[in-house]
Amino acid sequence: AHMDAKFRYGKSKQEIMEFIYDYLYVDDFAANSIYEYFVEQYTYAKIPSNQRLLIEYYKGFGDRRFVIFHSLFGRKVNDALSRAVAYIVARQYNTNVTISISDNGFYLSAEGTLGGLEAFKQLTPENFKNILTQSLNKTETLASRFRHCAGRSLMTLRHYKGEAKSVGRQQVRGKILLKFVQEMDNDFSILKEARREALEDYMDVNNALKVIELIANGQMEIKTINTIIPTPFAFNLVS
């Protein structure tokens, strides 16, 4: 928000460089690189911030489409947001969705129609956790967390009669047990703990929910742009 405001109010390069020095404690070369990076983003499009979620539509080679969310909330929050949005897109358009995340954003990619903004707007403070929980089903993330929880609760054994079970065998047995538990009781305590670890430890569902609440309350705006080539901030994600 600070950098965007300085560009909008026409601050000089020297003034912005001084702000970068005070804010980051970097040398001249690094400060100039940061300045030029932001100049390119501001000139070509818009600068995202903690008050603005920037959504960028970009069409790649062939019919591959990208929806890039410039969300500056950290990898764990972006992981949660991306999974929830991708789940809605996959279910609504019956398509396979590719996800890539970073500390400063994430993208969804698919062949054909990809309603990223429309899917994101379906997320509310009331349904977000439920949708994210549903998106974990049949994922390697939940299977891995469940295997660890099952091992700690002695549902599966790493050693039996003095022999160590291979990781591969533990993974196979863990997935079989997970499928059985999901069919038997979706509220099984070990399954609930595996979901909790995935949502709260592996991801950051609580702060992701705060982002949804900020948007719902009008405290964070959403801006969309269409680009022929990705913006400078998007290159690290799509390249």
Model-derived segments and spans:
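Extended, highly charged accessory segments
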Residues: A1-S239
